[in-house]
Amino acid sequence: MTLHNNNTTSPLFPNISSSWIHGPSDAGLPPGTVTHFGSYNISQAAGNFSSPNGTTSDPLGGHTIWQVVFIAFLTGILALVTIIGNILVIVAFKVNKQLKTVNNYFLLSLACADLIIGVISMNLFTTYIIMNRWALGNLACDLWLSIDYVASNASVMNLLVISFDRYFSITRPLTYRAKRTTKRAGVMIGLAWVISFILWAPAILFWQYFVGKRTVPPGECFIQFLSEPTITFGTAIAAFYMPVTIMTILYWRIYKETEKRTKELAGLQASGTEAEAENFVHPTGSSRSCSSYELQQQSLKRSARRKYGRCHFWFTTKSWKPSAEQMDQDHSSSDSWNNNDAAASLENSASSDEEDIGSETRAIYSIVLKLPGHSTILNSTKLPSSDNLQVPEEELGTVDLERKASKLQAQKSMDDGGSFQKSFSKLPIQLESAVDTAKASDVNSSVGKTTATLPLSFKEATLAKRFALKTRSQITKRKRMSLIKEKKAAQTLSAILLAFIITWTPYNIMVLVNTFCDSCIPKTYWNLGYWLCYINSTVNPVCYALCNKTFRTTFKMLLLCQCDKRKRRKQQYQQRQSVIFHKRVPEQAL
């Protein structure tokens, strides 16, 4: 923020008003003569404040005792709330592992900057207002201004970093999120603080040595190089108006992209419902399989080896044109495979126009299910009938559909031609058992992996449709959860950005007005505007709690001192589980 000095001893611009300088009628007055400005009595003797008779010093700066009590109480409460709120943010980040996300690292940095403002800046500025003069010396003045400006600018820089992080996370989810690590977030946070320090601290501390003298009068505290309104106007543009403009544009883009993704998710859910009703035939007429969604979700790869059999359905397609007689035979042989919907439900997601004539596409659906009788299958050379493959939903394990498409050379021969174009004639089933090594040694190696050929019936097609529906719903659920997280992060950003604009705008508007009229703004307004900038540090933790349920729950737990109880409950639960485990081990050994 930009400090200004206008008719006051606050760290505001020093040269905006001539009321600090005695007019012609005051020329030649001896030291100690008192000049009155409203309700404040300002002495010419080294900036000391005195009573109207000029004999006694006034530590209250001309304020009444009730004014001092009111100012001290109000500002003290605000400073205390700021300190407690930001300490809660830091402690919550420490104790709750759910809050240790990349986005919350930026909020942690913002909380540190706000804590510095609550501990140092607020209290020193309150003392400055009450005493109506700076009584701590030049070094303390420069240190206070340096800390205040660096922390305030770091808050703005952190808001910029958060805005860019949200923007790239929404618009470039695949490329940016792969690089979005805690280490990279730490580098960005460090750059925000280093840039803020380089911009303000050296100039504030050493400007008097650069120009060869100190022009700040005793009893006052302001930045020496901000003695010209035009310079102050430029710093206000760079420190406030430009960042606010950038953050507003980014937030608007984030909002539009979030709305777009919401509509896409609604369309995905609607298409899933229609596909279920129409046996996976896309509304546009082109058939789509669940594998097209798997290409968009590369994270759906899990292993299920324990007590699970792995069943590979190899659906082989052939691009060739059947004869009319063969079409008639197929029409009379099987109603299930004459159903266009059934054929389309198992068709590869790639369009026939994109395939070369004579090429063969092999789509592999790897369906992991819990086969109750897999040991029996291994001990027998005969495969179970198709009825055994129809497993109830409650017995299904993790469904992991993986599509692997590859173009192969055309087969040299076909068995008496095909039944219909792009149909699935044969179903080779390959069973890989995950039994223990001891059991596997008793089984002949030739029977360990049994391959047989069965005619593909409508039951297998129904089973595949059921698995595809389940996977489609899982993908939609993942997208919906991801979108909810993005919306929550966007809500937190919008609340922080709104609070920043509301609290910082009044003071920066006064800076613009002062450029054209240096005596139009009373001193009280300057003090209120500057304090309002500090209140932004008070509001930020409230924004976190209102927009983030995890923060809110952790704050409540910390304020009610329930942290130890939660830890004890977790330890007791772990002990109970350990006892249950040790009881079961001897029973299983017997």
Swiss-Prot record:
Residues 334-345 have a biased composition (Low complexity). GO terms for cellular component: basolateral plasma membrane; dendrite; endoplasmic reticulum membrane; plasma membrane; postsynaptic membrane; synapse. One of its GO terms (molecular function) is G protein-coupled acetylcholine receptor activity. It is a multi-pass membrane protein. The keyword Cytoplasm does not apply. The muscarinic acetylcholine receptor mediates various cellular responses, including inhibition of adenylate cyclase, breakdown of phosphoinositides and modulation of potassium channels through the action of G proteins. Primary transducing effect is Pi turnover. Homodimer; the dimers can form tetramers. Interacts with NALCN. Interacts with TMEM147. This is Muscarinic acetylcholine receptor M3. The gene is CHRM3.
